[in-house]
């Protein structure tokens, strides 16, 4: 009997050890030992759209596509790598650089990090979700694909964190999930996280929820958030697919698009195509070096708010070949770059747009 009990104990101990090893392997990533091989071109070959733009500390540009992987531009040539070279997924949603110079990619199926020609992958670890958001320093934040949570790298491990959900609330639509669509840090270091169904704010200690009720939406309006920006004045701009831009300033929220008469009178305030001259589907928001707020709309293109008036550049600048803007990015020289759905990158020169990639 004692031998049987001892054998069962050893088997359980072995199982626990193997589980811990598996968890550590997922948290610390999977190393692709072979060097990443890439193709090269003189011009950017992406056609599926540019969803992410990043300029690293050396001045190189990294461009993330909708479904073709990543391109690296060193000022002369474009190099490419995708799932064939070890990338977690070909849909790139965010790009960052850490303090050690490594380049991180948030993809539709996890996170990849590029380091000296090698890729290390961190698939979203659904087996070990974490509900406690313990404060750590030097965090990198990434979406978790379609999952209801967010990936956070704390400098050692990648952790999959679960959002606290609003209690007894209906998200109004079955396609509204808590998958991350945007991340922005404010001047106090708080992290604002946009999901389809709600906005979350993490202050280092607690996670605060901004749902339909807290954002004072009308009965015929629903949340379907696609972008968020914490600007230099402490205001939070929320891009909502269907009802336009919401502006959260301290404890009050207004519908910015409605205030500026940029929602069509016949709009159903959903995902349907909007009329020209409206701002109902903002997929991208950014602030330029002069404090102007820029919006990229799914159907009506580039908008600028200078604090008083709104300007729609797609109606006055014929250089913009595409209406849909996936991302707006401010580079190291304070140039504003626009990633378009047709696969090009445009720079605003102060008056009009020039295609640079």
Regions found by a protein language model. Give the residues of each.
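Carboxylate-rich, polar loop motifs that coordinate divalent cations or form catalytic acidic clusters
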Residues: 2-357
